[in-house]
């Protein structure tokens, strides 16, 4: 083996060994090939690119360091959740959100469901905040609020009734920020319960048995070319004057949201493409909660018919 190949092989085998130490080792093991240790050290420094800028092209051990790091460092992890795509055989969707059981508005909720029956929708999309979970909120608790058990019982009755009303429909339940409170409370306040069977919200509500698809709090849904989010996922603390406009400015694409309890619509454009629209839907809950009795909320929902969105407002139980 030639001296160059010999030294490069040692540099590869011992990339972290100091130049002088490596040179002494090479000379000790191959004294017949070199005059002294200093000659070996000169060549080691040369092939490691330590003698100046012109010799950097020989610094192959630096490439080896990179490969070594690639092999030793654990693979990077991503918390990205894969989006849910509405099946292509679905044609008409009823989107309802912000029911906040048991603080729902009877007239508004039943009017929306009746409209869905009339329109013969094949999909029901609960776009977040089916439940309220006031007692396990991070905000100041109102001890006069209903118990968590009562809220869960109401949700069970609602979901069972919904399945009976729409036996053949695809029903999707997307968690909103209020729905998320339950599982989050278990994980943070009572992690000892996590190994108990059927302790999480989806299990307590028997979603699998009711053939209801559950989407995570941060999971996107796509219906045709429209993204559907609850609204808390967006980088905006409030909806401003027009929540639909605020949402459009945040992500610049066709979108339907709830969360802000207000009905609005806004148009956007991507150069070279047709105009698109963003929508924020009204809620189906009580419009005068004790924590915010004065507000600009409205009751509402929407129908998506083959990608065409029609928003509806409910006033005193009448659809407009």
Give each language-model segment a name.
Residues 229-318:
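Conserved beta-sheet core of the metallophosphoesterase superfamily
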Residues 32-61:
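Major-groove recognition helix of helix-turn-helix-like DNA-binding domains
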Residues 69-106, 223:
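Mobile, glycine- and charge-enriched loop segments
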Residues 1-16:
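Positively charged, polyanion-binding regions of nucleic-acid-associated proteins
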Residues 189-227, 231, 238-242, 260, ...:
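Active-site-proximal loop/helix segment associated with metal-binding centers of metalloenzymes
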Residues 96, 101-208:
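Core catalytic region of metal-dependent phosphoesterases/phosphodiesterases
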Residues 20-33:
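DNA-recognition alpha helix
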Residues 91-93, 123, 226-227, 254-256:
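Structural motif
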């Amino acid at each position: 083996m030639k001296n160059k190949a010999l030294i490069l092989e040692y540099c590869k085998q011992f990339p972290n060994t100091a130049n002088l130490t490596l040179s002494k080792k090479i000379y000790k093991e191959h004294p017949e090939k070199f005059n002294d240790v200093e000659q070996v050290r000169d060549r080691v420094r040369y092939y490691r690119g330590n003698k100046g800028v012109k010799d950097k092209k020989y610094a192959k051990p630096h490439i080896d360091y990179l490969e070594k790091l690639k092999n030793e460092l654990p693979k990077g992890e991503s918390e990205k959740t894969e989006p849910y795509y509405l099946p292509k055989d679905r044609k008409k969707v009823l989107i309802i959100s912000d029911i906040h059981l048991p603080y729902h508005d009877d007239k508004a909720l039943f009017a929306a469901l009746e409209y869905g029956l009339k329109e013969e929708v094949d999909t029901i999309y609960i776009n977040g905040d089916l439940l309220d979970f006031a007692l396990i909120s991070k905000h100041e608790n109102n001890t006069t609020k209903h118990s968590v058990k009562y809220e869960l019982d109401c949700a069970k009755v609602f979901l069972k009734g919904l399945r009976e009303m729409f036996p053949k429909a695809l029903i999707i339940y997307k968690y909103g920020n209020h729905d998320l409170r339950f599982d989050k409370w278990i994980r943070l306040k009572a992690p000892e319960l996590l190994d108990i069977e059927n302790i999480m919200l989806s299990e307590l509500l028997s979603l699998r048995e009711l053939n209801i698809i559950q989407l995570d709090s941060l999971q996107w849904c796509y219906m045709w070319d429209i993204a559907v989010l609850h609204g808390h996922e967006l980088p905006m603390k409030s909806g401003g004057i027009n929540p639909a406009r605020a949402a459009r400015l945040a992500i610049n694409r066709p979108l339907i949201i709830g969360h802000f309890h207000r009905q609005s619509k806004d148009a956007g454009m991507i150069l070279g493409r047709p105009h698109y629209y963003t929508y924020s839907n009204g809620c189906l809950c009580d419009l005068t909660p004790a924590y915010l009795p004065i507000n600009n909320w409205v009751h509402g929902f929407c129908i998506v018919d083959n990608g065409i969105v029609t928003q509806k407002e409910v006033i005193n139980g009448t659809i407009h």
